[in-house]
Amino acid sequence: MNRKGNVYYSGVLAGRIEEVPEGYRFAYDSDYLATLGTRAISMTLPKSTKPYMSKVLYPFFYGLLAEGVLKETQCRKLKLDENDHFGRLLKTANSDTIGAVTVVEELEA
């Protein structure tokens, strides 16, 4: 079972990020790409029909994570491993993030 998250830009579904055996995969949503005026979620992840692959969590997404005391508090309250960056992203980046991007965990049906 791969962990997945829907990535929203200003409340609009922009793409999906998932944990895969090789690391992480981010792909823009085809409807988002087809909509005129939509922006890339990051300068480091320009709009593309090809998925992005990385062995480590993309720095852009890592930048959405809390640090210091807030990180410790979130991990303690949510019972998260401080070193599970992707798990932290899925559990904490769904609201009140810096900027226009949020990540909502995609739960298995």
Question: Where do the PLM segments sit?
Answer:
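Phosphate/dinucleotide-binding and metal-coordinating scaffold of catalytic cores
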Residues: M1-A109
